[in-house]
């Protein structure tokens, strides 16, 4: 895995990650069974961000999602750089969330993307 920074994005479903995101992470178990030391050594060199979008008070009710990822990153030794929680339910809704967009722009400026 050549990437230095990992960005995990998910809609917030029932105060946690989507089923697809959770399944992706659950699949790591196979790698941990077969190549645990190598897998964890690679993740320990990474920095990760979390971006979650939800409709129902995401900046408060999305915090369990953030905490879940904090535990995942603690387990894998991955540096947790931060998170952005935005408000949206329909396609394009996030464009009305100035706070989330500003937070993402701040991250982008640090990466010079």
PLM region spans:
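Glycine-rich phosphate/pyrophosphate-binding loop and the adjoining helix
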Residues: 59, 67-113
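Helix-loop-strand module that forms the ligand-binding subsite of alpha/beta enzymes
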Residues: 1-74
